[in-house]
Design a protein with these regions (language model features):
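Catalytic core of bacterial c-di-GMP phosphodiesterases, primarily the EAL and HD-GYP domains
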Residues: 65-134, 144
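Active-site core of bacterial EAL-family cyclic-dinucleotide phosphodiesterase domains
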Residues: 2-57
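Active-site beta-loop-alpha junctions enriched in small/polar residues
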Residues: 29, 93-95, 122-124, 151-153, ...
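Flexible, glycine/charge-rich interdomain/linker segments that couple
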Residues: 1-7, 87-92
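Single conserved hydrophobic/aromatic residue that forms the stacking wall/gate
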Residues: 207-215
Length: 215
């Protein structure tokens, strides 16, 4: 479990985080040669409920900010402990960003952490331009990359591409499942790829055995 009590955070936030009993697992993201690892995506694994249940509960109580802080601090701590050298991909709510005190605490505890980070903007719950401005300042100062998660779902559409100008776009599996036998999907994906590549963006496909079975 992540030792949140050791992190330099407000007592209220620490108390909430300590009660979550969260661990993190790391899913490798490969280069297109399917051999070399490009990044590790930190995936939250709460002990007492599913991730979806946890997010729904905190969204209902308007406390998603706590999960945002938990993910950045907890995932970074777990990543460093594992000794990984590849990029660390951290999920981030589009409606949240660090406070000034939290940003300072992050730098104090972990160092400046320049480079080797990818902030992956989730497709829910809602987009906040104010929070994105604050988040983008941190991203630029630290030379981090921005990834758009599950493009084609929720808030992550072309408007999000225009707003975030991400370095990486991850296509949602709904866009590609069954694409071999679906001319419309083929044309849609081709159009998206051309648009992303024209903007110098990389495209990532999340491969799973289920997706392979459906394709």
């Amino acid at each position: 479990m992540i030792a949140y009590e050791k992190l330099p955070l407000d007592n209220e936030v620490k108390a909430a985080l300590e009660g979550l009993e969260i661990e993190y697992v790391f899913q490798p993201i490969f280069y297109k040669d399917c051999v070399r690892i490009y990044a590790y995506e930190a995936l939250m694994r709460p002990k007492k409920m599913t991730v979806g249940q946890l997010i729904d509960e905190f969204a209902r109580d308007e406390k998603l900010h706590i999960l945002e802080v938990a993910t950045f601090f907890g995932a970074t701590q777990a990543y460093i402990e594992r000794g990984y050298q590849e990029y660390l991909c951290i999920n981030s709510f589009p409606s949240e960003s660090f406070t000034e005190n939290e940003a300072e605490a992050f730098d104090t505890y972990f160092g400046n952490q320049k480079g080797k980070r990818i902030i992956e903007i989730l497709e829910y719950p809602k987009v906040s331009l104010r929070e994105w401005v604050r988040k983008s300042e941190m991203v630029q100062n630290k030379h981090w990359k921005v990834s758009l998660d599950d493009f084609g779902m929720g808030e992550n559409n072309m408007n999000a591409v225009y707003l975030y100008t991400p370095d990486i776009v991850k296509l949602d599996r709904s866009l590609i499942c069954g694409i071999d036998n679906d001319a419309r999907k083929q044309e849609n994906v081709r159009t998206y790829l051309e648009s992303f590549h024209e903007r110098g963006m990389q495209v990532c496909l999340l491969y799973t055995s289920d997706a392979a079975d459906e394709a």
